[in-house]
Amino acid sequence: MTGNSSNGYGVSLVGSGSATPSQIVSNDQLALRVDTNDEWVKTRTGIRERRIIGADESLTDLCVAAAKAAVDMAGWGVESIEMVLIATSTPDDLFGMAPKVQSKLGATRAVAFDLTAACSGFLFGLVSAAQFLQNGSFKRAVVIGADQLSGWVDWDDRSSCVLFGDGAGAIAIEATAEEDDLIGFKMKSDGSRGDCLNLAQKRNFVPLVESYQTQKGDFSPIKMNGQEVYKFAVREVPSLLKDVLQTYGIVPESLDWLLLHQANQRILNAVADRFSIPHHKVLTNLANYGNTSAATIPIMLDEAVRDGKVQSGHLIASSGFGAGLSWGVALFRWHGPF
């Protein structure tokens, strides 16, 4: 799928927020449970620690906190929000987490729904929400990326448990009659390679009546072929990014920042090197949070905005990629107040 705004309104990115759990689990602490060590994890992934939701926290609460921060930065009243879209694969309620977040946020006018696209989820969610603003259906929306992967990993599998963490990030976007900040995007999927990274439903059947059976709802832990996912990312992300840059007439040198899904530092560096983008232009906080799936991009963007790295008018190339397999690239300008 390809697109940008050609009719109607533009979209402006005007606020960001993020929230992470209070529990911080270091590589050394994980080494008390599985056969690993800090150097092994850092060398292969770039991760030093991750945040894990504890007994007194919930993903819903993190979403609300992130959304409030984004709305406050934008200077909105919550009553002006018309859409709350949450990209998540791990909602607190399988029927949808967004309506509860909408209620706790006080955005009583907003339609609220979830979108599931794993690590590509936030980018897909941003593009999806933008369509409603560009065609005039809504004026203001909050897009949230949030996941609690700690509940779905096998904590005795050292190859996967060291990778993931929990968190939520949010972006406030609004329709504008001025130039569109969402310059363009492309999104792709390939379900034939879905077994490389999945969180599959268990096929557990229990007696129902007479000779009939019914499937009991349950899921297996996250399963990942790390080598295949790495090869997928370093092949497909640069290819699609090159396509998007050429389509919209942008040279890599004009980018202020490269903002990739925070999966593995080797992937981030490999994509940057393909375009001769200096590593200091690659936004990364992977060392502190690990892979938080749909939350990585908005958490990183919020941190960079609040740290003064990303400033109003900066041009950003962003890519989400992962389970599905799905991946996408978006070009946008930050228009927030910082």
Swiss-Prot record:
The keyword Transcription does not apply. This is Beta-ketoacyl-[acyl-carrier-protein] synthase III. Homodimer. Belongs to the thiolase-like superfamily. FabH family. Its main location: cytoplasm. The lineage of its organism: Bacteria, Bacillati, Cyanobacteriota, Cyanophyceae, Synechococcales. The gene is fabH. Catalyzes the condensation reaction of fatty acid synthesis by the addition to an acyl acceptor of two carbons from malonyl-ACP. Catalyzes the first condensation reaction which initiates fatty acid synthesis and may therefore play a role in governing the total rate of fatty acid production. Possesses both acetoacetyl-ACP synthase and acetyl transacylase activities. Its substrate specificity determines the biosynthesis of branched-chain and/or straight-chain of fatty acids. It comes from Prochlorococcus marinus (strain SARG / CCMP1375 / SS120). Its EC number is 2.3.1.180. Keywords: Acyltransferase, Cytoplasm, Fatty acid biosynthesis, Fatty acid metabolism, Lipid biosynthesis, Lipid metabolism, Multifunctional enzyme, Transferase.
